[in-house]
Structures are given as C-alpha cells and as structure tokens.
Amino acid sequence: MEDITQLLSDVLEDLVESELKQFTRQLWIGVKPGVEPIPRGKLENKDRQDVVDSMVQQYSEDAGTITVQTLRKIKQNERAKRLESNLLKVQSQGQENKQNSEEPQPIPQIISQPIQQIISQPINNAGSEDLQPIQADWQRPRQIIPCSQETKNTLLKAHGDDIYTPRSGTQRKGLALLITNIQFANTQHNRNGADRDEENAEWLLRSLGFAVIKYRNLSGKDIRRAVENFSKRREHEDADSTFIVIMSHGTRIDNKDAIVGVSDDVYFIEETFSHLNSVNCPALIDKPKVILIQACRGGQSSGVLAQDSVFASDSWVHMEKDFVCFMSTMPNTFAYRNPIEGSFFISYIVDVFCSSAHRDDIMELFRKVTLRMEKDQRFQGQAKLLPCIERTSISKRFYLFPGL
C-alpha cells in the first residue's frame, strides 16, 4: 500500500494548482455512480498529501483505480495512462513478492509420455485406461501431457472458425478465480480434505497457463464481492478465457443453487453469470467462461462419505454467451468428499485434464469426467454421484492447448 500511496503523491505533485482544484472538486462531487464522494471539508484548501491521505482512508486499495478515473474525468489522460501502468507494475511486483515469500511448490513439468505411466494402476479392468475410476489412493499427477504444435495445427485446420482461437503468445492467457471454503463459523461444518482440492485445482489451473487469484474461507457476501471484483479486472481484456472455481457447502433455495458461506449466509451461483455477462464484463465477450462448482445441491442420501451440504433444503431462467458451468452433482443430490484426499469431482477433473486436454475440447473433457464417475462402483445406488453440465452457451470448441 505504501508504494501505491507514493505513486498517488507523485501524480498529484505534477498537477498545477488549477488542475489540483479540478481534481479535488471531482472527488467531492463524485467520480462515478457507486463511488462514494469524499466530503468537501476533507479536500478543500488541503495540500496534496492531505488529499492522498483522504483518498487512501476512504477508498483503501481502490484509491489508485479511482485516481486514474478522476484524472480521466478532468482530461488528464496521459497522466491517467501513466499511473495505470505504474499501478499494474506495483501490483505485479506485490504478487511476485508474495509468491516468493511462500513455501516453494514443485514446478509442474510437461511431459510427452502417457499419463498412465506415472499414476497407480486402476483398481479394476474397465476397458480403456481413459475410463478407469479414481482409486482411493489416487495421487495427483505432477505432469500434464502437452499439445504438440502439429496437433494444434491439425485441430485448427479441421475445425477452423468452430474453435475459440488463442489470441497471442506462447501460452493461453487468462485469469482464474479459485474460492475454497474449509473452516466455518460452526466448526461441525468444516470441510476436511478441501485443502487438497484447493491444492489440486490451483496446480491444474497454473499448469494450463492461467494466473490464479485465490481466496479461502469467505462468507456469502465476500464471495459475491470477490466475483464482482474479479469481473472488473483489466487483465480480461487481453485474455482468451477464464475459469471460476468455487468449492464449499451448497444447497438449493427456491429451485436456485446456492453456495454456503463460512458464516452460513449464501451466494447464489446464478450471480456469477450476471457479474460475468456481456453487460457487466464486456472484456470477456466472445471468450469462454468456465465455472466449476464443488458443492451439494440439496437432496438426501445414505452415503457414508463426507457431504458438501449444510442446509436441509430448477433451472436458471436466462442464458449468456460462451458460458459453461460444470457442477459436481445433479440437482437435489449430495456431493461427496474424502476427508483426507478431497473431492472425487476435482480429482477426476485433474486426472482427465492431465491425460486428455492436449487433444480434447472442454465439453469432451467434461463428458469423460462424467463417464468415469458413472462407472465408479462406489457411487452406485443410493450413494449416486454424477456431475452435470448446467447452463451451457459455449458455441465453439474450446481447446486448452496445454504447453502452447
């Protein structure tokens, strides 16, 4: 925050007195709807540092963005552009420092040999290795099969305009949002094993080339704020696609799927579509938006594994373009989670993506996950566990092209 404060001070120092008056006046009359004005008494006849202090006190981490918007309001476009660039550099450096201060994680390596060579043999013979069920002692592969340039060229040639084509660069670019609730206000609702899901999901997203924004233990209100803030990230403008992964307890209220926050308030999943639709997130127009939900959806079951449900409690009304939502279970059904190893849904996704993302599009990957879970004998009868695709509006083939 100190770096941002210094940047704001430097910008205001460059303003002449008349420009500073325009700037402070804009702050007290209001920069834009939804941004609370700063009281006039805190700004009038104050020096530049006082103005900066008032902005930081009022807007906290948003002070930099609001300064950029205010500069544009008073036609200081070059200064706004320069400040925006400097803010991104500070933010990037902050994320890098945070990562460096954390315990280093093994860097995933991309290999060419089949994924089946590096994981344990399946518990039974079900035919194709691609269709084997996840065994109880499954461990996440540390590798992902890359897509060769030849395979990519073949797919592009075969399907042409029917593919979401990566924009540029050596790797598909995009942001991913990862929210995992583990510890709840009511400790009886704690989701043991969910930390493994978080670790596995983050590893997969980073291996696929996505920058991951991660949150843990959020209330329903905080989930709403996190998704809304994510939808406003400027990085989406240069992105090819995005992933949103939310893992918590879940329920259904008035035929609507809801995520349960750590304070037992809820976040309705349909809000994610609203925040990321063409109106509220124009930067993601015509780009795939993949939503993965590990949570219960109401219902009852006699299964013996941990269940991602808290409340004892159809379909959405409107559609948006280029969305697909893959949920861990059918409506009115529990989702299961191993208290040590994490959820079967996330484990299957990681396993299938590692072995098949180099050649299959996203819908085929989801089909393989569903088929493998359907064949898993642990989830037959009353303890049924079958994921489903909801509210899809994907209009083209979405290939992840790992490694390219």
Swiss-Prot record:
Query: Propeptide residue numbers?
Result: 1-171, 301-316
Q: What is its EC number?
A: 3.4.22.58
Catalyzed reactions = Strict requirement for Asp at the P1 position. It has a preferred cleavage sequence of Tyr-Val-Ala-Asp-|- but also cleaves at Asp-Glu-Val-Asp-|-
Cite a single Pfam family from the UniProt record. PYRIN
Q: Where in the cell is it found?
A: Inflammasome; Cytoplasm
| GO MF, one annotated term | cysteine-type endopeptidase activity
What residues does the Pyrin domain cover? 8-80
Q: Name one GO cellular component term.
A: NLRP1 inflammasome complex
Main EC class the enzyme belongs to: hydrolase
Keywords of this entry: Apoptosis, Cytoplasm, Hydrolase, Immunity, Inflammasome, Inflammatory response, Innate immunity, Necrosis, Protease, Thiol protease, Zymogen
Query: When this gene is knocked out, what is seen?
Result: Impaired pyroptosis in response to bacterial infection with E.piscicida. Morpholino knockdown results in no observed phenotype. Morpholino knockdown results in impaired gut bacterial clearance following bacterial infection with E.piscicida. Morpholino knockdown results in pericardial edema, erosion of the tail fin and body axis, and impaired up-regulation of il1b, tnfa, il6, il8, il10 and ifng1 cytokines in response to bacterial lipopolysaccharides (LPS).
Q: Active site: which residues?
A: H249, C296
**What does the record say about tissue specificity?**
Expressed in the spleen, kidney and liver, and highly expressed in the gills and gut.
What modifications follow translation? The two subunits are derived from the precursor sequence by an autocatalytic mechanism.
Per its record, what triggers expression of this gene product?
Up-regulated in response to pentachlorophenol (PCP), a toxic pollutant. Up-regulated in response to bacterial lipopolysaccharides (LPS) and bacterial infection with E.piscicida. Up-regulated in response to bacterial infection with E.tarda.
Activity regulation: the record says: Activated by homooligomerization induced by direct binding to cytosolic LPS.
Query: What information about domains appears in the record's comments?
Result: The Pyrin domain mediates LPS recognition and homooligomerization.
The UniProt entry's sequence similarity note says: Belongs to the peptidase C14A family.
Q: What does this protein do?
A: Thiol protease which cleaves IL-1 beta (il1b), releasing the mature cytokine which is involved in a variety of inflammatory processes, and mediates apoptosis. Component of the NLRP1 inflammasome, which plays a crucial role in innate immunity and inflammation. In response to pathogens and other damage-associated signals, recruited to the NLRP1 inflammasome in its precursor form following the recruitment of caspase caspa. Its subsequent activation causes the cleavage of the midformed pro-il1b and results in il1b maturation and secretion in the extracellular milieu.
Assembly and interactions? Answer: Upon direct LPS-binding, forms large homooligomers, resulting in its activation. These oligomers are often referred to as 'non-canonical inflammasomes'. Heterotetramer that consists of two anti-parallel arranged heterodimers, each one formed by a 20 kDa (p20) and a 10 kDa (p10) subunit. Interacts with caspa. Interacts with pycard; the interaction only occurs in the presence of nlrp1. Component of NLRP1 inflammasomes.
Q: What is this protein called?
A: Caspase b
